[in-house]
């Protein structure tokens, strides 16, 4: 399996090991510093079965040009960078897209209460 990690510098700023992912097969970590265009994303994802990203937006043309892609994981709580149309198209193509829906929920609640206490 080939896994491409886009936004590698955000997902792993240097304190996490990629070794676990390397055990899954071929790993390509792309440390893009700016928003890549569709052609660049397509080039990076060629031959990949899985992709991981944080904030890079993906459009339909990317999925159309990457027929082997079957799984996309977003290291975020939402799907903001993917349009509803893209999510429907991915479902039609059998591409699984997942996120981390409960990431940071306790920390956000704790922070909100700390801010409320600061007002007292």
What are these language model-derived features?
Residues 1-48:
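N-terminal glycine-/charge-rich "phosphate-binding" loop or analogous flexible N-terminal tail
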Residues 49-120:
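Phosphate/diphosphate ligand-binding glycine-rich loop within oxidoreductases
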């Amino acid at each position: 399996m080939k896994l491409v990690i886009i936004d590698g510098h955000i997902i792993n700023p240097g304190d996490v090991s990629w070794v676990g992912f390397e055990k899954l097969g071929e790993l390509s970590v792309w440390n893009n510093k700016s928003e890549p265009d569709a052609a660049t994303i397509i080039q990076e994802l060629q031959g990949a079965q899985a992709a991981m990203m944080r904030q890079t937006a993906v459009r339909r043309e990317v999925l159309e040009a990457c027929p082997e892609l079957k799984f996309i994981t977003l290291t975020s709580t939402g799907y903001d960078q993917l349009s509803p149309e893209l999510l429907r198209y991915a479902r039609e193509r059998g591409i699984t897209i997942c996120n981390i829906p409960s990431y940071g929920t306790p920390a956000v609640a704790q922070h909100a209460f700390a801010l409320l206490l600061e007002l007292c």
